[in-house]
Amino acid sequence: MAARRGRAKRRKVCYFTANGITHIDYKDVDLLRRFISERGKILPRRVTGTSAKYQRKLTIAIKRARTMALLPYVAD
C-alpha cells in the first residue's frame, strides 16, 4: 500500500491563550470580526483553533455585539 502524502497538519493555537487575552469585550469589533465568516456566521473551533473556554466567551461577545448593532446578523 502506498504511503499517504500530504501536508503535515499544523496544530492550531488558541489566539487568546497565545496573546494573554483573558477578557473578550463585545465592543472590540475588530477582534470579533476575525472569528466571523464572510456570511456573518461564527466560525467553529476546528477552523479557528480557539479553546473551548474562549470559544464560549467569544460566542457570548459576538451575540451581545449583534444585539447592540455593532455587528450584523447576516452579511450584506
UniProtKB/Swiss-Prot annotation:
GO terms for biological process: translation. SUPFAM superfamilies: Ribosomal protein S18. InterPro entries: Ribosomal_bS18 (IPR001648), Ribosomal_bS18_CS (IPR018275), Ribosomal_bS18_sf (IPR036870). GO terms for cellular component: cytosolic small ribosomal subunit. The keyword Lyase does not apply. It comes from the Bacteria. Coiled coil: none annotated. Gene3D superfamilies: Ribosomal protein S18 (4.10.640.10). Keywords: Ribonucleoprotein, Ribosomal protein, RNA-binding, rRNA-binding. GO terms for molecular function: small ribosomal subunit rRNA binding; structural constituent of ribosome. The keyword Lipoprotein does not apply. Part of the 30S ribosomal subunit. Forms a tight heterodimer with protein bS6. Binds as a heterodimer with protein bS6 to the central domain of the 16S rRNA, where it helps stabilize the platform of the 30S subunit. Belongs to the bacterial ribosomal protein bS18 family. This is Small ribosomal subunit protein bS18. The gene is rpsR.
